[in-house]
Every structure is written in C-alpha cells, then in structure tokens.
C-alpha cells in the first residue's frame, strides 16, 4: 500500500508538471482530468471511499463540462503538443528529470531526513478497518451538509452555474 501511495503521488506530481508546461488548452484539460482521477485514487487509497467517489463525480462531472465548452471555443487547427516546441519539451523533461532525481535521492541517501515517514501512514488514514465501528464519518458529514447546510448547497450550485455561463460568454467574446 505504501508503494501504491508513493506511485500515485509521483504520477500526481508528473501530471502537474505536464499541466504547468501548457502546450495547448486541449492537453492541459486532459492532464487536469487525469490528475483529478489520480488525486481521487489517493483519497481512495487512504480509506476515504465516499469522499473519493464524491470528489471524482463532482470534479470530473462538472469540470469536464467546463473543459468541453472552453476547449471548443479555444480550439486551434494545429494544437501545440508537448514535443512540438523546444521550450515546451525542455520544460516537461526538466520537470520529469527533477522528479525522478528527487525520488532517487530520497531512496538512496540515508542521511536525508524525510518529513513524512512512509512506514507510518496510518495517521493519514480516514478509516482504518480496526475497531467495531459500523458508522463511517464521511457519509455522515455529507448528510449533515445537505441537512443543515441546504442553502449553502443551493448557493454553491447557483454560483457554479453562473461561473460556467461567465466562462462561456468570455470564451465566445461577447
């Protein structure tokens, strides 16, 4: 499990390197979607099944609509890929080399003090399987949000709708 969490973290950082190089809006949106899915897998790996599912549905359901509209409005005939320009390719390669170098340095050097010990990720876990508890905390929190914070949910939904409308209008040029 520790290696899976470490691998997911490396993939997440490499996704952010791919997004920060910004070759084209199409590829940037694709890398954000992949990074969001990997981030949800990290949450699932730490035991937050409900929270990982909700984040996956909200992020990938809502943001893919926004990415679809903005990409359709800003589409290029020949989009620039990560290997098409020298500066974009160099920035991606520098980021990947730095990530791999950091991983190898932390793995090989015994004198490196790591702030997070990967052998004790139990304190990061949302739900550990030990004990006789039958009620998990994350669905109860979502139920309380929809029960006591119903107006907050309505305002948040309206704000997201207005945000999508504003992005579409700005991308269209009106």
Swiss-Prot record:
GO cellular component, one term: mitochondrial inner membrane
Enzyme Commission number(s) of this protein: 7.1.1.2
Localization, UniProt: Mitochondrion inner membrane
Record's keyword terms, sorted: Electron transport, Membrane, Mitochondrion, Mitochondrion inner membrane, NAD, Respiratory chain, Translocase, Transmembrane, Transmembrane helix, Transport, Ubiquinone
InterPro entries documented for this protein: ComplexI_Subunit6, NADH_UbQ/plastoQ_OxRdtase_su6
Transmembrane segments: 1-21, 24-44, 47-67, 86-106, 111-131, 151-171
MF-aspect GO terms: NADH dehydrogenase (ubiquinone) activity
Main location: mitochondrion
Membrane protein topology class: Multi-pass membrane protein
A GO BP entry: mitochondrial electron transport, NADH to ubiquinone
Catalysis performed (reactions): a ubiquinone + NADH + 5 H(+)(in) = a ubiquinol + NAD(+) + 4 H(+)(out)
Family: Belongs to the complex I subunit 6 family.
Role of this protein: Core subunit of the mitochondrial membrane respiratory chain NADH dehydrogenase (Complex I) which catalyzes electron transfer from NADH through the respiratory chain, using ubiquinone as an electron acceptor. Essential for the catalytic activity and assembly of complex I.
PANTHER family on file: NADH UBIQUINONE OXIDOREDUCTASE SUBUNIT ND6 (PTHR11435), NADH-UBIQUINONE OXIDOREDUCTASE CHAIN 6 (PTHR11435:SF1)
Subunit and partners: Core subunit of respiratory chain NADH dehydrogenase (Complex I) which is composed of 45 different subunits.
Descriptive protein name: NADH-ubiquinone oxidoreductase chain 6
The species this protein was found in: Pongo pygmaeus (Bornean orangutan)
